Amino acid sequence: PDSATAMPLTSENQIIPGNVDLAETSKQQRVTNYYRPFEAALSERVVLMGMPLMITVHSFTPVFLGEHRQVEIGVLHDEDSRFADAFLQQTLTDSRFNIQRNQPYAPTDGVTHTLTHHALPHGLANVMLEIRNDLIASPLQQQEMAAYLAKHIVLALERI
């Protein structure tokens, strides 16, 4: 929440009106009302569930700053690449998507916050999956992508 990118003024070329001239008290109110409760709930779940793996899922636009993105599924990791390595190896058997490591973002972009704050301290294997949003635009596409990912997540988990 303290990062300059937590409440950016723009997204790509678009101004985010709610973040323009945002007072420090308003920023802190957002952190208190939204971020802290989410972080506390997630921390509690990680401990209670004793899960072996943490996956965060996001989507990204096919075009960014006028550049067409070729990657269709990004497999992002920070310092712990165990699951990313296994997932990338597993998906080599099914090449229907352009899947790339640390694309369209990288840890240096500050996108692995949840993984570094909740998975790494508990020794959990972890990964952030980024899906190009034109591939999940319809309910049918979403179901198909969920099935694809679920299959390969289970098989990759068996590899680590």
Briefly describe each language-model feature range:
Residues 1-160:
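N-terminal catalytic or cofactor-binding beta/alpha core of small enzyme domains
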